[in-house]
């Protein structure tokens, strides 16, 4: 179908007209007629003489008919007629009256036929005009703007699926840019065939199932991401707990050191720690005094134990690390008073001997402890 879009608005412009085209239907008063004659005289100063103004009397009426370029006047008195004829002969070919001037003169009532020209710059078709095609009776609407024309029509579609087939119409919009009129557009008469996806895209009537699927997918994504975040946080907390626990165990291990384990193996369950004095020189002096005092006391006791063991049986030699119970029992077995002087002399000799032999025993024990 061929659609021709043209303008429905026309511009009526003022046109110049001659006296032969003026049709008067009423007569004016005397003063109005005089003013009109004065207006005509100003248009054709070179053609109308001053005798026309002086010779006209108060009884002159407005011209009532116009034909073939000459103007006739009605005279009710005996005024000279030659002046009127002179006026008509000089005006017939030179006077033109603009329609704008006639609109200002209230003495005339004219029925003119305006000149009609089509507009070529702006399409002014009514905003919502519905036209009916004469060929296929298709309905379309035309909307206009400043530079465009919008045509809306119905397009037939045929949708086919496995179980159903149906036809329907959807509105289509075509935009035509304004150019030299007339604008031409052909509405397609063929039927467009498609499946349900096309129907869903055009109207959205069959997208309910797809919308639910999309919502289910979104819900699944949200739930999965939440569960994943929770599991990740739990794993991170567990790993951090293990790392902190291992560090604490390492710190506790380093405080006790290697000697703590050796002391545990030789039945020294407790490790005493003493605070170091603030003055390092006092620490050195205390260490020397403690070492000398303990060495003298140990040498005295060891010599006495060795002497008593040799005097009792001569087979077992008591040692501070071995046989302490036998040493204590043997020590209280000697109670006679006459042996005290002898024992004192023997103790002096044995103390010197034990002082010589003790360092070797301590070195041996320390070596065994390090091996253990």
From Swiss-Prot:
Protein name: Uncharacterized protein YDL211C
Keywords annotated in UniProt: Membrane, Phosphoprotein, Transmembrane, Transmembrane helix, Vacuole
Topology versus the membrane: Single-pass membrane protein
Protein origin, superkingdom: Eukaryota
Species this chain originates from: Saccharomyces cerevisiae (strain ATCC 204508 / S288c) (Baker's yeast)
Extra facts: Present with 3360 molecules/cell in log phase SD medium.
UniProt key word Phosphoprotein: yes
TM helices/strands, residue ranges: 224-244
Keyword Membrane: yes
GO cellular component: fungal-type vacuole; vacuolar membrane
Subcellular localization, as worded in the UniProt entry: Vacuole membrane
Residues recorded with modification Phosphoserine: 329
